[in-house]
Amino acid sequence: MEILNNWISGINDILWSYVLIIMLLGCAFRFTFKTRFVQFRMFREMIRVLGDSANKAHEGEKHISSFQAFAVSLASRVGTGNLAGVATAVAVGGPGAVFWMWIIALLGSASAFVESTLAQLYKRKGKESFIGGPAYYMRYGLGLNWMGILFAILISVTFGFAFNSVQSNTICAAMQGSFGFDPRIVGAVLTVLTLAIIFGGIQRIAKVSSVIVPVMALGYVALASGIVLFNITELPAVIKLIVSSAFGWEQAAGGTIGAALMQGIKRGLFSNEAGMGSAPNVAATASVTHPVKQGLIQTLGVFTDTLLICTCTAFIILFSGAPLDGSVNGVQLTQHALTLEVGKAGGIFVAVAIFLFAFSSIIGNYYYGEANIRFITPKKSVLYIYRLLVGGMVMFGALASLELAWSLADITMAFMTICNLVAISLLSKQAFLLLHDYIVQKRSGIKSPVFDKNKLPELKDKAECW
């Protein structure tokens, strides 16, 4: 097991130290400038379209609304990356890692806009709802079926297996730390609950996510806000520490700026998924009047995840004065920090929050896998086998080591992200055209723009569902 972990860590170091940092930041900067900072100038419009109901004029009653698509994607985003991932980033990369998480969210949200807009453009009609995602725009946009199948395999393994093992591992660690529960029992219960929901299909997943996600996010933000207000006099010092740790001379001399940068980008991507190619799978299912609407919705999801919830975790840890020497790591660091702030109840709260956050992620992660298994083959038997394997990986995660679980997630996430970034870079001009069309309609006085493919000849043959 140690040999496997060392081999995987070696590959991860190459991918995350060079390849992905260049690609993620390069795409993020390009999309930010090409869209003229869409993630900032259209923030009010993001809030407005969040309340749009499903467009049922032609598609029927089963398609999900913008908010439900937002909730399912946020269910995947808001998970252990927000509590355990941020803690790991701060423990390994120092407080400066938080700064780089902010940067990758602010810039990377433009990548989220492009990928989700493209997913809407290339979506297809399924039996229950629309279907789509990177595999579809690789097949129908680039004409590269092999690339679509490769991505579908990567995301099915990454989210259904690797990420879900991380979520399960973190839940078990939190429950064992707070209540002394046996990981085997917790893992068995998680497996049963997971299988019960994922055999219910996207409609059940959407309904469960739209209830769990707002409740858990608001509860966690409320607690963190209380801690920030209680320590308000220390807030300037904490922010100064974050920024100085990202650029300071001491960090440069010690070589930790690179660690902060790498951890910030790695854990930031694991948490907000901007440019990874995951959120477009659920963005495509939404029934909207214009592809840009889901691009805006998923951009808002990145902000909610990183700038709000991840920041809450970082502040809780830094306010508490918990040791960042590696003696406490992962979710245990977050639990320890909250215990220092509000007493034993804090650790219990984190255990409950982790269960809700991570379990909702397991549900959302599974959907990404299912959507891509359907892309590879229509056989129901394959889908049923995949569901059972997902359940098996949830149980595996409960028993595996934390280090191996994270390493597997990092390497599969890296390969699928590279695949997706190449695709959206090649197709990005189409997203820019759609954004221009949307803005022109808004400026002409149309409150809720409607996409008419006949007005954009360049996209007419691409938009089957429009």
Residue map of PLM features:
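Extracellular/periplasmic helix-exit of transmembrane alpha-helices
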Residues: F113-Y122, K127, L223-L241, W249, ...
